[in-house]
Amino acid sequence: MKKEDPIEESRRYVENARKTLRENAKLDPEENRYQDDKYVKAAGNYLWGGVLIALDAVFHVKEGRKRVDINCYRSVIKKRDRKLLGLVNDGYEYIHLYMGYDGSLSKNLCDNSFHIANEIIDKCAIMLGQKPELIA
């Protein structure tokens, strides 16, 4: 069986997150806020999962099925790419905490989270010798 390309898989997670927000979270255009935090949380978790797949492909931090602490990623990334470290720190805060745990209803925060996730995935794609999807 052919192994999935981790960058393609990461981007699939991003699209699933985008689809979840678009179809289920009920955007109020007047307030520029989503109405249902359940779907914002789900989208945040999909998005963070996609980021972790890309990071694992480059840095090989994950061992088996054991959960890896964010500090393990930080220590490995810090040695290789400080800009990526900043993005991962922002991603952890915006995507994992604000979206995934808190279910922040702000569309601006969610849009920024997608931008951060795509930047991280693109940097990982470059490190793997692949073409980035978007460079900001």
Write out the residue ranges for each language-model feature.
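Terminal alpha-helical segments
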Residues: 1-136
